[in-house]
Amino acid sequence: MADKIAVLLGGTSAERDVSLNSGAAVLAGLREGGIDAHPVDPQEVDVAQLKAMGFQKVFIALHGRGGEDGTLQGMLELLGLPYTGSGVMASALSMDKLRSKLLWQGAGLPVAPWVALTRAEFEKGLSEEQKARISALGLPLIVKPSREGSSVGMTKVVEENALQGALSLAFQHDDEILIEKWLCGPEFTVAIVGEEILPSIRIQPAGTFYDYEAKYLSDETQYFCPAGLEASQEAALQSLVLQAWKALGCTGWGRIDVMLDSDGQFYLLEANTSPGMTSHSLVPMAARQAGMSFSQLVVRILELAD
């Protein structure tokens, strides 16, 4: 008898709507590939009962907290259910932008200069040292919650008097935030499925940066795959991404986002261990360039589940 597969979608994070779209696409793709797949929304169903409900494997199409931060992965480990994507530690590290940056920096990999702040520090008032460190980053800045995805709570700051509002917004979503130097070059993303590094994608948003609207709502965001890099640049990008992937301990499938600054240097932005799978999503786009249909992609990801 074929395995009964749970496709986890929706959930309770700020990225619920994106996850519902991802999950619906994954469900259709798995069924097209002959898989006995069923939708399960953790907002409505107790996922601790998945094994009792007869499921043998889990395809995680959840984004954000409770889906790709290691908590769900830990529960599935305890249940003894194989699942797609990275394990507990790699999922938790990848969801946490600050810890990812610290780990990559420790491994000698390039990351943008940053300052981290906690909610307690913000509410007490920034010290002169903290103000000086933020000032040294220059303008523009990018302010982001450490543990949110899909650019939720993120702001580009171009004037000093806008910083306070950007910090307040980011702290609505997390107790720890990052203030980063703005990198002005193009953004790239590189997907990994199993041992295969897929062709890179260059992202060109219509607005000032690749925010939530550009990712999921706008039809004006442009994607280039192949990315138009020289062969040596593409090789350097893929090598950097693989090092970043391995440093975090990621497995299965996912995506690493990278910026090419005006100095010609690639800088790591963040890792995504449960990337979007909507009509606007990037992993399916890279897979198509590599000759893989959407159905073949999701079946392959499921095969990698352990």
Curated annotation (Swiss-Prot):
Enzyme Commission identifier(s): 6.3.2.4
Stretches assigned to the ATP-grasp domain: 101-303
Record carries keyword Magnesium: yes
Places the protein is found: Cytoplasm
Family matches, as Gene3D superfamilies: 3.40.50.20, ATP-grasp fold, A domain (3.30.1490.20), ATP-grasp fold, B domain (3.30.470.20)
Catalytic activity, as annotated: 2 D-alanine + ATP = D-alanyl-D-alanine + ADP + phosphate + H(+)
Source species, domain of life: Bacteria
Molecular function in Gene Ontology: ATP binding; D-alanine-D-alanine ligase activity; metal ion binding
Cofactor note: Binds 2 magnesium or manganese ions per subunit.
Positions of Mg(2+) 1 binding: D257, E270
UniProtKB keywords: ATP-binding, Cell shape, Cell wall biogenesis/degradation, Cytoplasm, Ligase, Magnesium, Manganese, Metal-binding, Nucleotide-binding, Peptidoglycan synthesis
Cofactor: Mg(2+); Mn(2+)
Main subcellular location of this protein, as a coarse class: cytoplasm
Listed GO biological process terms: cell wall organization; peptidoglycan biosynthetic process; regulation of cell shape
Positions annotated to bind Mg(2+) 2: E270, N272
Annotated SUPFAM superfamilies: Glutathione synthetase ATP-binding domain-like, PreATP-grasp domain
Binding site for ATP: 134-189
GO CC list: cytosol
Record note on quaternary structure: Monomer.
Similarity field: Belongs to the D-alanine--D-alanine ligase family.
Record's function text: Cell wall formation.
Protein name: D-alanine--D-alanine ligase B
Taxonomic source organism: Salmonella typhi
The organism's taxonomic lineage, starting at the top: Bacteria, Pseudomonadati, Pseudomonadota, Gammaproteobacteria, Enterobacterales
Originating gene: ddlB
